[in-house]
């Protein structure tokens, strides 16, 4: 078996571009802002792409403290957390329990909304793709706390590094409100560095203008 290479932001950006996960252009977001790029982690839908993403999460988690359980919010976070658990085991020789939540509670079988590793009394890291408004993360944090977990932190694939409704970004708001660290595999700055290195002047200028208007 070939040992996976360590995660590198540029390699991930190139893979994201090749899969259509990341696009540069003009995109209207739900917020109404016209963004010069769009990121859709749902298109990381093959083994190579998912493996590279999971390697990034796993590498980052080995630098974090208090990793008792890793948790993927339904639905998109479920394959991410499962693949990350595999990467932690195969690459870092760390067997970390993992779990996820259902959108709707079951009243038979396992029951409830939580599936997988027990979280009561555990320090839990949440793994997701992005934090846009922070609503979904807050909901998951509430579910986990109600189950007796301590939230150790959140890992996301992309930090857009842009303000929400106020002066803080959605990630900064979550960090301040919930008093937990939030780490990202790549940031808007990484995207801009990539464009600069590739000589993509028009796309870079659009990113710079957007960051001046909405950046943190």
Curated annotation (Swiss-Prot):
Gene Ontology MF term list: magnesium ion binding; orotate phosphoribosyltransferase activity
Its needed co-factors are: Mg(2+)
User: In which domain of life is the source organism classified?
Assistant: Bacteria
**SUPFAM superfamilies per record:** PRTase-like
What are its E.C. numbers? 2.4.2.10
Q: Where does 5-phospho-alpha-D-ribose 1-diphosphate bind?
A: 30, 75-76, 102-103, 106, 108, 128-136
The protein's annotated catalytic reaction(s) are: orotidine 5'-phosphate + diphosphate = orotate + 5-phospho-alpha-D-ribose 1-diphosphate
Q: Which GO terms describe its biological process?
A: 'de novo' pyrimidine nucleobase biosynthetic process; 'de novo' UMP biosynthetic process; pyrimidine ribonucleoside biosynthetic process
How is this protein annotated for GO cellular component? Answer: cytoplasm
* Residues given in the record as orotate binding sites: 38-39, 132, 160
Q: Which UniProt keywords apply?
A: Glycosyltransferase, Magnesium, Pyrimidine biosynthesis, Transferase
Q: In which pathway does it act?
A: Pyrimidine metabolism; UMP biosynthesis via de novo pathway; UMP from orotate: step 1/2
Record text on subunit structure and interactions: Homodimer.
What does the record give as the function of this protein? Catalyzes the transfer of a ribosyl phosphate group from 5-phosphoribose 1-diphosphate to orotate, leading to the formation of orotidine monophosphate (OMP).
Of which family is this protein a member?
Answer: Belongs to the purine/pyrimidine phosphoribosyltransferase family. PyrE subfamily.
Q: What is this protein called?
A: Orotate phosphoribosyltransferase
Q: Which organism is it from?
A: Acinetobacter baumannii (strain ATCC 17978 / DSM 105126 / CIP 53.77 / LMG 1025 / NCDC KC755 / 5377)
Name of the gene encoding the protein in the UniProt record = pyrE
């Amino acid at each position: 078996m070939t040992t996976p290479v360590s995660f590198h932001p540029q390699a991930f950006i190139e893979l994201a571009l090749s899969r259509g996960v990341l696009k540069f252009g003009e995109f209207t977001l739900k917020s109404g802002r016209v963004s010069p790029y769009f990121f859709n982690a749902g298109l990381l839908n093959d083994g190579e792409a998912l493996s590279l993403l999971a390697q990034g999460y796993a590498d980052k988690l080995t630098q974090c403290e208090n990793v008792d359980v890793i948790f993927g919010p339904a639905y998109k976070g479920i394959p991410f957390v499962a693949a990350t658990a595999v990467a932690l085991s195969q690459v870092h020789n760390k067997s970390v329990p993992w779990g996820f939540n259902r959108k709707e509670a079951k009243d038979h079988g396992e029951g409830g909304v939580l599936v997988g590793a027990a979280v009561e009394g555990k320090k839990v890291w949440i793994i997701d793709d992005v934090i846009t408004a922070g609503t979904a993360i807050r909901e998951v944090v509430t579910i986990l706390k109600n189950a007796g977990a301590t939230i150790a932190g959140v890992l996301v694939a992309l930090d857009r590094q842009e303000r929400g409704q106020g002066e803080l970004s959605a990630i900064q708001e979550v960090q301040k409100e919930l008093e937990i660290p939030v780490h990202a595999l790549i940031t808007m700055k990484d995207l801009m560095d990539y464009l600069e290195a590739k000589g993509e002047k028009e796309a870079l200028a659009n990113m710079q203008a957007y960051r001046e208007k909405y950046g943190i």
